[in-house]
From Swiss-Prot:
InterPro entries, A to Z: Ribosomal_bL9, Ribosomal_bL9/RNase_H1_N, Ribosomal_bL9_bac/chp, Ribosomal_bL9_C, Ribosomal_bL9_C_sf, Ribosomal_bL9_N, Ribosomal_bL9_N_sf
Biological process, per Gene Ontology: translation
Gene3D superfamilies hit by this protein: Ribosomal protein L9, C-terminal domain (3.10.430.100), Ribosomal protein L9, N-terminal domain (3.40.5.10)
Source organism (scientific name): Helicobacter pylori (strain P12)
Function: Binds to the 23S rRNA.
Protein known as: Large ribosomal subunit protein bL9
Family the entry assigns: Belongs to the bacterial ribosomal protein bL9 family.
GO cellular component terms given for this protein: ribonucleoprotein complex; ribosome
């Protein structure tokens, strides 16, 4: 019997492949556990159409992420904080604060705190380069200027 795999199956194939299996294995295990469907022309064409839509959606999302990275690289985020006598901040600048200030100063950029990579919290004034990982292999940086209030 010919089946279309819906997910990767060890020693058989990867999702989307059409495989020839024995009737019992196909009906009693693969189809029963929704790991595969009977490979008819209709099922194969439907799966290919869904895969194509998914690939187009992923390409669009990646393009949007690349556009966001290009925009991020052109900005410098300014954060005003109270500073002690030796130039250190009262408190530290964290990922949450960076995302809040980014939304305030640049409303079109919507980053989540999990997208920002901080090696350590920022505790003094100066200019810092912050790394942003948006998924799909898209990585960028932007600058933060921490100034005394």
């Amino acid at each position: 019997m010919k089946i279309l795999l819906l997910e990767d199956v060890k020693n058989l194939g990867k999702a989307g492949e059409v495989c020839e299996v024995k009737d019992g294995y196909g009906n009693n295990f693969l189809i029963a556990n929704q790991k595969a469907k009977l490979a008819t022309n209709e099922v194969i064409n439907k799966y290919k159409a869904e895969a194509k839509k998914k690939a187009e959606k992923e390409a669009l999302e990646k393009a949007q992420k690349l556009q966001m990275v290009e925009t991020l690289q052109t900005i410098t985020l300014t954060i005003h904080k109270k500073v002690g006598a030796n130039g250190s901040l009262f408190g530290a600048i964290t990922k949450e604060e960076i995302t809040e200030r980014l939304k305030e100063q640049h409303a079109s950029l919507d980053l989540d705190k999990k997208d920002i990579e901080l090696k350590h919290p920022i505790k003094s004034t100066g200019i810092y380069e912050i790394e942003v990982k948006l998924g799909s292999g898209v990585v960028g940086t932007f600058k933060i200027d921490v100034v005394a209030e």
